[in-house]
Amino acid sequence: VVTARRLDDGREIWHKRLKPVIKDDKGIALKGAGIAYNGQRLFATTGFGGVFALEMKTGKEIWRYDTEMPIRIAPTTENNRLLVQTIDNTLIALDALSGKEIWKYKTTAEATTLVGGASPAYSSEEDVAVAAFNNGELRAFKASTGTPLWSEMLISPKRTNSLANITAIKANPIIDGDKVFAAGHSDVLMAIDLRTGKKIWEREISTSNQPWIAGKFMYVLSDNFELIALQKDTGKVVWNKKLPVPEHNAGLSAIGPVLANNSLIAALSDGHVFAISPYTGAILGFINVDDEIGLSPVIADGVVIFTTNDADLLAYK
């Protein structure tokens, strides 16, 4: 179900139940994968492989596309292009206006991987799309035709534990100017030239979270609960702050960061949320939302919105 709510008080505006093509399909359930917005339309992907374009104001269905394969990743959209990635490592480019398939690319998939995945990055200005696959591959495409441009494996030869041996990429890659920034689950954070695929710098940082870029800096929350500030152009570490976590933290995960009102917001999956100085890494304050959270917060008009594991929305000024 996709639901639109008012930002100021949370009141529902509309909701739309997205149904599979095969009505009695109860296998992979009706779990949603994610949504994207291009300024005109809302796009939603679902666990049963459906891609939907909806009217923003009413939720009315405009078109739908069936991938015939489960989706666990939010789509990416810019201008009139929509990029969708399925769990079998297939990247599909659709026309956002009509839902017509433009091109498709498929690579090998890993038998053992992580739940979810990374949404593709897309620059309409450069006509380049960058997708991260669960086999550890980062690949760039000419967005208009699907022609592969270059690829890089985000796998460290120094993997030290069983989790690091999982090659899946969960952190969304980021296109920033003429560079791509991408992080793998197996101790690799890279800056890559967007046009050539040449590696600019690399650091041994493992994260399942999309880094946050602000000006000349990049902020990364590692899987070891370390919030790290780096110089974007060189990869040099400016500061490193370990979040306060309990000694026994099995099952706990790090979430974020996002930058809001000159503070970095980072969280733990048990509901502890921290405001941190982007200049020094000092903790400015914290709250406990008293619920488990699994998704990075969203910032809108000075409001920080958390989604709990029970599908509740929590909004904070």
Language-model regions, residue ranges each:
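Beta-propeller domains
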Residues: 1-17
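Short loop/turn segments that connect beta-strands within beta-propeller blades
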Residues: 7-9, 55-58, 95-99, 143-146, ...
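Extracytoplasmic beta-rich repeat domains
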Residues: 12-36, 63-78, 101-126, 151-175, ...
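Structural signature of WD-repeat beta-propellers
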Residues: 46-47, 86-87, 133-134, 184-185, ...
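Loop/turn-rich, solvent-exposed surfaces of beta-rich toroidal or solenoidal domains
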Residues: 217-232, 236, 240-275
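C-terminal closing repeat unit and adjoining cap/tail of repeat-based domains
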Residues: 263-311, 317
